[in-house]
Amino acid sequence: MTQQIKYKRVLLKLSGESLMGSDPFGINHDTIVQTVGEIAEVVKMGVQVGIVVGGGNIFRGVSAQAGSMDRATADYMGMMATVMNALALKDAFETLGIKARVQSALSMQQIAETYARPKAIQYLEEGKVVIFAAGTGNPFFTTDTAAALRGAEMNCDVMLKATNVDGVYTADPKKDPSATRYETITFDEALLKNLKVMDATAFALCRERKLNIVVFGIAKEGSLKRVITGEDEGTLVHC
């Protein structure tokens, strides 16, 4: 029986940390294989998938790692870290027989295409996974903002924010055992309750463009597929 697909084209935001697994830094092979396997399953269902990946598993511009380094320089280093992650994802997809393309907001033609919106949309329509690297290409903007921007540019049905928790909670579930998960919440309610769904710039862009967000746990087996088919998974942040 063919499963109902709620979202035809999605922008998936993956943090760099989600690729570390149990390692203290870098890319964990088993973790990236598991993550890509989950995504490949929905691609085979006919879902068009764009991915924005962070670089925090390698280097984060806003961190103690950067020390007294110039902020713009540190951010550019973080962008290059996202390119490394994007190449690793592309390799993992192609190992599974899924065609993938990396588009970078910074020009590095030997290893990735330079971002071009029409070409990216064409790839999505052809069933290829498009991995957007190097954030927005500008310092001082997070990869959350890059994800909101690419999601809007690609005319995605939804932005999927993969995290290490399975949704948005009333409080930090690691600190407060009585915290409960929201199944749905509006943008206005999230602002009123000061729930940190993502950074303010990204959140404002999604709200303005009416790009709904689903926050879910990518490490939970089958979670992405359940989101795509409209099951109760994660938290839907909507207009």
From Swiss-Prot:
Protein's cellular compartments: Cytoplasm
Its annotated pathway reads:
Pyrimidine metabolism; CTP biosynthesis via de novo pathway; UDP from UMP (UMPK route): step 1/1
Mention any one GO cellular component term assigned to this protein in its UniProt record.
cytosol
User: Does this entry carry the keyword ATP-binding?
Assistant: yes
- Residues reported in the UniProt entry to bind ATP: K13, L14, S15, G16, G56, R60, T163, N164, Y169, D172
What is stated about the way this protein's activity is regulated? Allosterically activated by GTP. Inhibited by UTP.
Question: Which Pfam family is an annotated match for this chain, by its short name?
Answer: AA_kinase
Q: Report the EC code(s) recorded for this entry.
A: 2.7.4.22
Q: Which HAMAP family has this protein been placed in?
A: PyrH_B
Free-text function comment from the UniProt entry: Catalyzes the reversible phosphorylation of UMP to UDP.
This one is known as: Uridylate kinase
